[in-house]
């Protein structure tokens, strides 16, 4: 088994390419899709979350026990919640209160603290 990772973080971004047979046949080219849904948090946003955490660590902006705060509609928050909890950070996610209950529950189950806000209309003057 050569595709065994030491931890789930090593799996972020290391998702397989899948040949799209019908598209390949129609075009006469080999066309592949990157299966980003196989990232640990279920989306490409895991990559962004990992990059944000790594950058903050490298710049010494965060250390174990520190807090990560993100305003998000969900997927970046899921990635940050997953990483934050596993790396020893407190994660606070600020999101609209009209997001699905499933998304809110998932974020809480990942160890994130939610701060729900009511969306307001925006007018650019």
Task: Please identify what each model-predicted range represents.
Residues 1-125:
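PLP-dependent amino-acid enzyme catalytic core
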């Amino acid at each position: 088994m050569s595709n065994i990772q030491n931890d789930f973080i090593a799996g972020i971004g290391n998702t397989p390419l899948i040949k799209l047979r019908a598209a390949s046949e129609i075009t006469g080219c080999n066309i592949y899709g990157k299966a980003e849904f196989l990232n640990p948090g279920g989306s490409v946003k895991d990559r962004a979350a990992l990059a944000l955490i790594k950058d903050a660590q490298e710049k010494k902006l965060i250390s174990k026990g520190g807090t990560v705060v993100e305003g998000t509609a969900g997927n970046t928050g899921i990635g940050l919640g997953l990483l934050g909890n596993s790396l020893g950070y407190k994660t606070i996610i600020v999101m609209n209160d009209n997001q699905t209950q499933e998304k809110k529950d998932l974020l809480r189950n990942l160890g994130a603290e939610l701060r729900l806000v009511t969306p307001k209309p925006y007018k650019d003057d």
